[in-house]
Regions:
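Individual transmembrane alpha-helix segments
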Residues: 15, 180-193, 278-385, 464
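Membrane-interfacial loop-to-helix junctions in multi-pass inner-membrane proteins
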Residues: 45-66, 89-95, 99, 119-137, ...
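Hydrophobic alpha-helical membrane-insertion segments
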Residues: 62-71, 133-153, 229-240, 332-335, ...
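Membrane-interface helix-loop-helix modules in multi-pass inner-membrane proteins
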Residues: 64-134, 151, 435-438
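Aromatic-rich transmembrane-lumenal/periplasmic boundary elements in polytopic membrane proteins
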Residues: 149, 229-324
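C-terminal substrate/ligand-recognition segments
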Residues: 367-430, 461-485
Length: 495
C-alpha cells in the first residue's frame, strides 16, 4: 500500500514546480504578441519610435523567456523521479508530445529568438519581423504539445492497453493531437497568455505615467496592449465555453465540484457564491441547452440515467468492474504461458472491463470526490478576476483614446496593482483543471496514488524544500532584473 504522505508530498512538489513554471509561460505567450504587433507597426510606418518600443518589451520578454525555460526543464525530470509508475504505464503516449515539443518547437523558438534578439542591425526589417512572429509562434507550438499531453490525461484517447508490456500504447496519433479537450485547452491557455501580457504591459506603462516618464511610449504601449488584451480575453471566454461543454461530457465530477453541485438535474443553476444561484445557467454553459441535464456529485456516485436514456454506472459498480479487470489481468499474466486458452478467456474479461481498470484501485466512493471547496473557489477567482480585468482594459482603452488617462491617477494605480491579479487568475484556472480531476492522474485509468514512484517520503520532502528555495531564487532574480530594466526605461522620449 502506498503511503498517503508520499502521494501528498509528490503532488505538492509537482504543484509547486508547475505553478512556478506557469508564472513565466503566460507572459511569454502574451508579450510575444504585443511586441510583435509593435514591430509590425514599425515595419509598416518606419517610425523609429516603434522600433525602440518593441525592443524595450523584447528585453523584458527575453528575461522572462530564459527563466521560464529553466523552470520547465525540472518538470520533465519529475515524471521519472516521483511518478515512475505513471511514466511506465503511459510513457509511450505521454512521451511523444513532450519529445516533439523539445525537438521541434524549442529549436524553432531558440533559432528565431537569436535572430530576433541579436539581429536588429544584421538582417532586413521584414526578416527580423518574421523572426519575432515565429518566436511567438514557436512558444505557442511548445504550449500546444504540452497541453496535448495534459489533455490526454484529462480525456485519454487514441491508445489501447497491452497486457504483455503492462502499458498503454498509442494507436492513433491524430486522435491524441485533435483531442477536443486539447483543442479547447490550448486556445484557452494561449489567449489567457495574451491577457497576461497585456495586463503586464498596461501596468508597467502606467507606472511610467505615475512617474511622469516616457509619456508617448506609455500611452502607445497601453493602446496596443489593451486591444490585444481585450481580444484575448474575449477569446478566453469563448474557448472557456467550449471547455465547459467538454468537462461536462468527459469529466462531470470536475464540473460538479466547480459548482458545488450535490444534486443535479435539468435547468441546473449556476452558483455565483454559496446561496446565490442563477437558475438554468449551468445547463446552458454545460450543454448549450436550458433543459440540458447536469449530474451532481451524488448523482455521479449513485449512478444516473440521462433524459436521453444514457446510463452511467454507480461508483460501486465501476469499482467492482475495475477489480474484475485487475483480477483478469493477473490471471492472463499468470496463465499466458501454461494455459493459453484460459489466458485468452481472461484477456476477453480484461478487454470488456478495461475502461474501469483504474477504479479497481479505489477503496471507497468518497475517494472519487475532489476537494470541492478548493475547486469551487478557484473557479470563482479565475472567472471573477478575469471579468474584472476585462472591464479594466476597456476602461483604460477608453481613457487613453479620450486622452484622459494621464489625469486619472486612480486608474493608473489600479492598472499597476492589477498585475498580480492576472497571475492569480491563471493559477486558479490550473487549480480547477488539476485539483478538479482528482483522484485521477489519468481520468478513469490510473489514480494518483498508483502513479507515484517507490521513493521515501523524506526524499520527496527534501527535494520539495530544495525546489522551493531554487524556484523562489529564480523568481526573485527575474523580478530584480525586470525592475532594473524597467527603471532604466526604453529611452524613447525626445520631447
Amino acid at each position: 500500500m502506498v503511503e498517503s504522505a508520499l502521494v501528498d508530498w509528490s503532488r505538492l512538489q509537482f504543484a509547486l514546480t508547475a505553478g512556478y513554471h506557469w508564472i513565466f509561460v503566460p507572459l511569454t505567450l502574451g508579450l510575444a504578441v504585443v511586441m510583435a504587433t509593435m514591430e509590425t507597426i514599425y515595419v509598416i510606418n518606419g517610425d523609429e519610435f516603434w522600433k525602440k518600443t518593441a525592443k524595450f518589451w523584447m528585453k523584458l520578454f527575453a528575461i522572462n523567456f530564459a527563466v521560464g525555460i529553466a523552470t520547465g526543464i525540472i518538470l520533465e525530470f519529475e515524471f521519472g523521479t516521483n511518478w515512475s509508475n505513471y511514466s511506465w504505464f503511459v510513457g509511450d503516449i505521454f512521451g511523444a508530445p513532450l519529445a516533439i515539443e523539445g525537438i521541434f518547437a524549442f529549436f524553432m523558438e531558440a533559432t528565431f529568438f537569436a535572430v530576433m534578439f541579436f539581429g536588429w542591425e544584421k538582417v532586413g526589417k521584414r526578416f527580423h519581423l518574421a523572426s519575432t512572429w515565429f518566436t511567438g509562434i514557436g512558444a505557442a507550438i511548445s504550449a500546444v504539445w504540452i497541453l496535448v499531453a495534459n489533455s490526454w490525461m484529462q480525456h485519454p484517447v487514441g491508445m489501447e492497453f497491452n497486457p504483455d508490456t503492462v502499458r498503454h500504447e498509442m494507436v492513433d496519433f491524430w486522435a491524441l493531437v485533435l483531442n477536443p479537450v486539447a483543442v479547447s485547452k490550448f486556445f484557452h491557455s494561449w489567449f489567457s497568455g495574451w491577457m497576461t501580457g497585456a495586463i503586464f504591459v498596461i501596468g508597467i506603462s502606467c507606472w511610467y505615467l505615475l512617474r511622469g516618464r516616457e509619456r508617448r511610449f506609455a500611452l502607445s504601449s497601453i493602446r496596443v496592449a489593451s486591444i490585444v488584451g481585450i481580444v484575448g480575453t474575449l477569446l478566453v471566454m469563448f474557448s472557456g465555453d467550449s471547455s465547459a461543454v467538454h468537462v461536462s461530457k468527459y469529466q462531470p465530477m470536475k464540473l460538479a465540484a466547480a459548482e458545488g453541485l450535490e444534486e443535479g438535474g435539468t435547468r441546473a443553476p449556476f452558483s455565483i457564491v454559496p446561496g446565490v444561484e442563477v437558475p438554468g445557467v449551468l445547463s446552458i454553459l454545460a450543454t448549450h441547452d436550458l433543459d440540458g441535464y447536469v449530474p451532481g456529485i451524488n448523482n455521479i456516485l449513485d449512478g444516473y440515467t440521462t433524459p436521453e436514456g444514457d446510463v452511467y454506472l454507480s461508483a460501486e459498480e465501476k469499482m467492482e468492474r475495475g477489480k474484475t479487470a485487475i483480477e483478469a489481468f493477473g490471471t492472463y499474466r499468470t496463465l499466458k504461458q501454461s494455459d493459453p486458452e484460459a489466458a485468452q478467456e481472461a484477456r476477453a474479461v480484461l478487454d470488456e472491463n478495461i475502461d474501469y481498470f483504474g477504479y479497481g484501485y479505489i477503496d471507497s466512493r468518497e475517494e472519487l470526490v475532489p476537494n470541492v471547496p478548493l475547486v469551487y473557489w478557484a473557479f470563482r477567482i479565475m472567472v471573477g478576476f478575469g471579468g474584472l480585468l476585462l472591464c479594466l482594459m476597456f476602461v483604460v482603452l477608453w481613457a487613453e483614446r479620450r486622452k484622459r488617462l494621464e489625469n486619472m491617477r486612480w486608474l493608473q494605480w489600479a492598472s499597476l496593482l492589477s498585475i498580480p491579479l492576472v497571475y492569480i487568475a491563471g493559477q486558479a484556472g490550473w487549480i480547477v483543471a488539476e485539483a478538479g480531476r482528482q483522484p485521477w492522474v489519468i481520468e478513469g485509468l490510473l489514480p494518483t496514488k498508483a502513479a507515484v514512484s517507490s521513493v521515501s517520503v523524506g526524499a520527496v520532502q527534501t527535494t520539495f524544500f530544495l525546489f522551493v528555495a531554487i524556484f523562489t531564487l529564480f523568481l526573485a532574480i527575474e523580478i530584480r532584473i525586470l525592475i532594473k530594466a524597467i527603471k532604466e526605461g526604453p529611452k524613447t522620449e525626445i520631447e
